[in-house]
Amino acid sequence: MPHPDGDLDRRIELLTAQIIAARKAYYQENTSLMSDVEYDALEHELKDAEHAKGFSDRNSPSLTVGIAAQLNLFEPVKHIEPMLSLDNVFSLDQLHSWYEKTKKICPEGDQCTFVCELKIDGVGVSLRYANGYLISAATRGDGAIGEDITQNMLYVPSIPPRIALPGIFEIRGEAFIKRDEFDRINQLSLERSKQFANPRNFVSGCIRTKTPNMRYLESISFYAHGFTQVYGYTSGGMNLHSDITASGGVKTEIEHGMFSAYSRLSECKIPVNSYNRLCTNFSEIESYIENIRLNRQCVPYAIDGIVVKIDSLQKQALLGSTTKAPRWAVAYKFPSESTVTRLLDIEVSVGRTGRVTPYAVLQPIQLDGSEVSRATLHNQKVIGDKDLLIGDYVRIRKAGDIVPEVLCALPEKRDGSEVLFKMPSLCPSCGAELMPSKLGDIDLRCPNMQSCLVQLAGRLEYIGSRGVLDIAYLAEENAYALSHLRKFGKSAEVQLFKITIDDLVALEFMYKGNMRSPFRKKGDSFPGFEEPTKSAQDMVDSIERAKRSPLWKFLLALNIRHIGPASAKALADHFGSIESIINAKIDELLKVRSLGETIAISVHDWFRDPWRVELVNTWRSDGALFGD
């Protein structure tokens, strides 16, 4: 049944907000809000909805890539040509359809060749060389403007600071870490409260930081997968016929093809993947994919598919690109792999909004190149629907090759010792009685938002994140420590803008004293100095800067349930001040574009709690401007 226009508009706005939030988390906060499969499904649904509407905004996620660079942290770098994404296909039939359509660019009787490459699960990087010297390295950003990460990328051993090619080139490629290197670093990080979640997030965090860790950066690798030049061919072309022996290179006459260009780049010491293959028909492409699929675990780094490109640079130029992706390339995504392990226990965690989420404690097992020992189970209904008992053998997979997921139980392996799981009735953190937020809700929540220390620590961590108030070093460990500091404790959130250097010196994570840290192994300690660290000063400076954040970011910082970046911006634009939002009635909130009844009620009810109004008033009196 077709959507009424109003419903379709609201659905498009919701999908847009979800996709932008996921991109921001992925590209700026080095984390994942959802699996690749879930994200791809959102993008496909948005395209379908816009098609049904007969219109798409030029800034729609369906027509754009990445997310705007964080120019408050990094200098901007304008790419010579847009650094685009790739369209995805999820079956060989879809890939064959793309192949047949793309092959039509080739004249009758002219062989059309394709390059097959591994789709490495890393971070896209653009390297700019001028007359042989590396002058900048940048992230993808929004495809047009990226973030300057040159100083960090200079530590990556496989990136040459000088190459034997004249002129100005941008080399596009993937920064990644090999599995054994990632495992080695995680072994060296046992003193941390938690290890790095996955290789991709590790790489993103390493190259997108103002405080680089040389040891970590030296573990990162790079492979080139594209290039462009200020002059000569565009859309992936550079004049590789040039006689460059004067620059120390080897004179090589080649056709203007991607595969032969890779060979030329390799001669110039630019790393190129040895798994790249030239294919002359679809049967060869299919064989390549099957061979990689069967031997995927032999590849020393994480991959999630195969990229297929037309080889001819001239034909690439003829096919061109959309605003989001080239028409001459596509990514075939592998189905998620699965394996069997034991469900040892089911435990629960408490989130920043009070939601209590069960998760599976698994017999540790290797899956797709990394050890898996935990997987979310969402809620009691999911556990029941999947017929899970503690002690079961279960089949698991990585959804989107990242997030561990329990698919089902294997009841035929039961021996009678299995135990039924029941959600706890009390909060494991504060002891409050758990309950649904409203009649009919599946999720249980801890209603003690003001005093539950786990919720408080989660809110502080969220407040400090890059997408909210961007407070340096206010991450998980530090948020936990603040919420347990005797001076603040349960009022740490309210007193956030009162924090001083002296307060941070009292925290072990900011103090170079000989106190044992709760986040380190027994017996570990800090060196014996008694002055605040640079980290402490950076954090205090960040708190001061955060006072001048725009109103919509403060709305996020208040941790109002259901409020994301899109709805926060809509509220800020509509009302203009925090006081107007506090005093707004539900019918006034419903007039805000893209706000439905659920969000309107959530915002209205949030400001009816006296302690939350006190939070706003205290922040205001402590210098927070709320966008004024």
Swiss-Prot record:
Molecular-function GO term, any one: DNA ligase (NAD+) activity
Keywords: DNA damage, DNA repair, DNA replication, Ligase, Magnesium, Manganese, Metal-binding, NAD, Zinc
Disulfide bonds: none
Cofactor annotation: Mg(2+); Mn(2+)
CDD domains registered for this protein in UniProt: LIGANc
Annotated positions binding Zn(2+): 427, 430, 446, 452
Catalytic activity: NAD(+) + (deoxyribonucleotide)n-3'-hydroxyl + 5'-phospho-(deoxyribonucleotide)m = (deoxyribonucleotide)n+m + AMP + beta-nicotinamide D-nucleotide
EC numbers: 6.5.1.2
GO biological process: DNA repair; DNA replication
Active site: 119
Keyword NAD included in the entry's annotation: yes
Record-stated family: Belongs to the NAD-dependent DNA ligase family. LigA subfamily.
Function: DNA ligase that catalyzes the formation of phosphodiester linkages between 5'-phosphoryl and 3'-hydroxyl groups in double-stranded DNA using NAD as a coenzyme and as the energy source for the reaction. It is essential for DNA replication and repair of damaged DNA.
Record-linked PANTHER family: CHROMOSOME TRANSMISSION FIDELITY FACTOR 18 (PTHR23389), DNA LIGASE (PTHR23389:SF9)
Name of the protein described by the UniProt record: DNA ligase
Lineage: Bacteria, Bacillati, Actinomycetota, Actinomycetes, Micrococcales
